[in-house]
């Protein structure tokens, strides 16, 4: 693929030497493909990756002209139903672009101040888990840096009867605030949905109703639904019920091959503004084209579109934009902006270059699809290695960033505080000082001061620091933050798991001895047994956390962890008392008692440190 792109780029460069730059720009994509050849290139790409898709739809446009649009594959392979112009796909987080357009519309009307405290627009006391005094503004929501951790509660339900109002869903799923507003980028579905709720509050309209009146109808998007249950468009619902979802992974060289039929995979997103929009390729193309229209029908004034497409957040102290009022910036051979989306039933991507007015939309009926959602935009916009950010970069310093990092888009409060240490990023410098590895695998390559390129990707990392001096590796919609304790926390989890296994073995041996009538009572035997059972109980709690237990079990499991921690402490006291008061105790028995005391103290500390008792966070 890279060879093909390289050849195309070389040909385009040679051609540009014979023609004026204006003519070349008007008739080629940013990667150098002539408009007339776009279909040939995409279809060749589809053939090259024919084992990687069930169905996808792609469109390429330039201004108000659609250069290419086609549906590939099947929405129901079992019944041989091919995708067509009536096929609807879930757009996932591309839905957030509708939130941000709505916000900018209300800002244009003078009804919404982007820099005001959002509590101005919310019911009194709505936000109950704020940690910092600094106000959260709409700009923080647009840039995903309000400081919230990930949500712990399920954001979608399988039964339509379980759908609740947007306000109730937000109240029920409010995450803890773990970062100071403006300090750290941490992608937040909850924060985006909160912005959608503010649109409701400010406009006085139901969010879905607002979108239909102010975005869908002006653009002629009649084949698009907004509500989580499709109640706003019966036709879309009927079409959606025909579409199956698939999980296809096709990397045989890595031993990763999977092809699974997921059925319709229909679910109902409670925070629906953040991810429920569903519609056809034609409709999403209309929406995308509006962003490169000089007379954008979304706003009264062209200045509002200009403001929306201007940078609102940057990487560190650089002049490299990260976000443009809710739209993520991606550096291909040219700078683009847009949004990707993923749901249980599909993946999507919308990308455009405001300078050339060229754009791409890709829709699929596949979970976690990346080959087409990211491969086709690269085909059209080229590779970052041809971008001035890359070609003009120079390495004048080499900071040592080796260490352990946790993602800002994580869980840091409550009983799931254990999560970051189970998924942290260890970085080491390889023999080449500009190559970094993680667990022996290539992780990133330095290509400039503070700049690192990810393997086989147009994504890059920018090295900066947090307000408290920790190294922070910024990566588009989130960051990796240096954490000196996370490796020790991971070790503690391993030690505890080992203690649980040892405890289980000891109980089995004890049971066998009792059955064989060879077991002899020991001093403080009940206290020792209670501590062992409590350790097992905490082990069960840990397993339930790791397997994503049902939300209904949250409170009882936390209570079990709390009670078990207390039992371990009490057991430690009585066992220690026996250890020091029983004068005739043999040496081996003393070792066992000391081990029991240490195990109980470790378990109690484990419960407290990882907040396994904390169900209210």
Where are these regions (language model features)?
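Hydrophobic (often cysteine-bearing) scaffold residues that line and stabilize catalytic clefts
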Residues: 38, 42, 91-95, 99, ...
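N-terminal leader/targeting segments and the immediately adjacent pre-domain N-terminus
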Residues: 3-83, 89, 105-112, 143, ...
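Membrane-proximal extracellular juxtamembrane segment immediately upstream
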Residues: 459-484, 536-564, 606-609
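Catalytic loop of the DD-peptidase/beta-lactamase superfamily, centered on the K-T-G motif
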Residues: 26-71, 212, 262-513, 518
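Juxtamembrane interface at the cytosolic side of transmembrane helices
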Residues: 503-536, 582
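Short, surface-exposed loop or secondary-structure junction motifs
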Residues: 76, 130-350
């Amino acid at each position: 693929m890279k060879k093909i792109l390289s050849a195309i780029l070389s040909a385009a460069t040679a051609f540009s030497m014979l023609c004026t730059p204006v003519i070349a720009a008007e008739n080629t994509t940013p990667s150098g493909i002539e408009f007339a050849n776009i279909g040939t290139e995409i279809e060749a790409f589809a053939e090259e990756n024919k084992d990687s898709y069930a169905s996808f739809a792609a469109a390429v446009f330039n201004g108000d002209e659609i250069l290419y649009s086609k549906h590939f594959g099947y929405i129901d392979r079992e019944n041989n139903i091919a995708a067509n112009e009536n096929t609807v796909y879930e757009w996932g987080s591309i839905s957030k672009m509708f939130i941000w357009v709505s916000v900018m519309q209300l800002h244009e009307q003078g009804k919404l101040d982007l820099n005001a405290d959002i509590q101005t627009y919310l019911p009194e006391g709505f936000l109950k888990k704020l940690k910092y005094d600094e106000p959260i503004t709409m700009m923080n929501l647009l840039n995903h840096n309000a400081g919230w951790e990930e949500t712990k509660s399920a954001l979608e339900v399988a039964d339509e009867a379980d759908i609740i109002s947007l306000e109730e869903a937000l109240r029920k799923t409010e995450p803890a605030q773990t970062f100071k507003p403006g300090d750290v980028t941490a992608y937040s579905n909850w924060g985006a949905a909160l912005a959608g709720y503010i649109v409701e509050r400010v406009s006085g309209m139901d969010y879905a109703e607002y979108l239909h009146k102010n975005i869908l109808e002006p653009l002629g998007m009649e084949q698009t639904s907004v509500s989580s249950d499709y109640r706003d468009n019966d036709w879309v619902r009927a079409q959606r019920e025909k579409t199956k979802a698939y999980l296809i992974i096709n990397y045989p060289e890595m031993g990763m091959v999977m092809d699974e039929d997921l059925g319709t995979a229909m679910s109902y997103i409670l925070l629906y503004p953040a991810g429920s929009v569903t519609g056809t390729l034609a409709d999403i193309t209309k929406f995308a084209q509006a962003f490169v229209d000089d007379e954008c029908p979304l706003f009264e004034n062209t200045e509002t579109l200009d403001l929306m497409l201007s940078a609102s957040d940057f990487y560190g102290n650089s002049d490299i934009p990260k976000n443009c009022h809710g739209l993520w910036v991606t550096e291909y051979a040219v700078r683009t902006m847009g949004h990707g989306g993923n749901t249980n039933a599909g993946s999507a991507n919308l990308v455009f270059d405001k300078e050339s007015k060229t754009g791409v939309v890709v829709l699929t009926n596949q979970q976690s699809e990346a080959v087409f959602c990211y491969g086709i935009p690269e085909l059209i916009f080229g590779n970052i290695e041809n971008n001035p950010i890359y070609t003009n970069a120079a390495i004048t310093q080499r900071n040592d960033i080796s260490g352990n990092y946790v993602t800002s888009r994580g869980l840091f409060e409550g009983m799931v505080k254990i999560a970051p240490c189970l998924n942290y990023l260890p970085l080491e410098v390889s023999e080449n000082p500009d190559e970094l590895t993680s667990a022996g695998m290539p992780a990133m390559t330095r290509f400039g001061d503070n700049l690192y390129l990810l393997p086989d990707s147009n994504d890059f990392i920018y090295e900066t620091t947090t307000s408290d001096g920790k190294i922070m590796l910024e990566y588009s919609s989130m960051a990796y933050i240096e954490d000196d304790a996370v490796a020790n926390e991971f070790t503690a989890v391993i030690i505890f798991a080992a203690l649980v296994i040892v405890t289980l073995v000891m109980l089995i041996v004890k049971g066998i001895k009792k059955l064989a009538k060879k077991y002899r009572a020991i001093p403080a035997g009940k206290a020792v047994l209670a501590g062992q059972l409590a350790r097992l109980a905490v082990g069960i709690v840990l397993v339930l956390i790791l397997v994503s237990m049902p939300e209904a079990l949250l409170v009882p499991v936390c209570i079990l962890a709390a009670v078990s921690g207390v039992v371990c402490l009490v057991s430690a006291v009585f066992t220690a008392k026996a250890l020091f008061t029983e004068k005739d105790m043999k040496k081996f028995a003393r070792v066992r008692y000391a081990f029991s005391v240490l195990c109980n103290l470790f378990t109690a500390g484990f419960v407290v440190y990882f907040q396994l008792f904390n169900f209210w966070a």
